[in-house]
């Protein structure tokens, strides 16, 4: 699947990093929604319908894990990548055990980020394909 088919929501309260992430992802061919807070992300998620969310861990108001928890309740298959300048092994273990797809510490290499994005979207695409195949199999059963 080409990158242009994918929508990525980026959430960070640092405007400079938000611009940088948006530029890098857009240059890689993704459609990007850049939002400054978890609250704004929740308000826009149903409209933008992202295939992936990348969020800062520590933000004023709703932090990245609270955002993840809300998104995960609504759409468990939606992959989320957490970015943080305050990374620790216990935080990473907690995040991944709760279902976060990836966890990157700032500063991060753009190549590492794009690799995580590609992996997350590949998994999402494979899950969608399996669901489609199951739907087709069900449909065939109904018409036989």
Q: What are the language-model segments listed below?
A:
Residues 29-36, 44:
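Short hydrophobic/Thr-rich beta-strand motif most characteristic of the beta2 strand and flanking loop
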Residues 19-27:
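Charged docking surfaces used in two-component/phosphorelay signaling
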Residues 36-40, 63-66:
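Acidic catalytic/metal-coordinating carboxylates
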Residues 88-90, 104, 108-118:
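C-terminal output helix
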Residues 43, 65-76, 94:
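Short amphipathic alpha-helix used as the core "switch/output" element in two-component signaling
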Residues 48-54:
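Active-site beta3 strand of CheY-like receiver
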Residues 59:
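Receiver (REC) domain active-site loop signature in two-component systems and cognate sites
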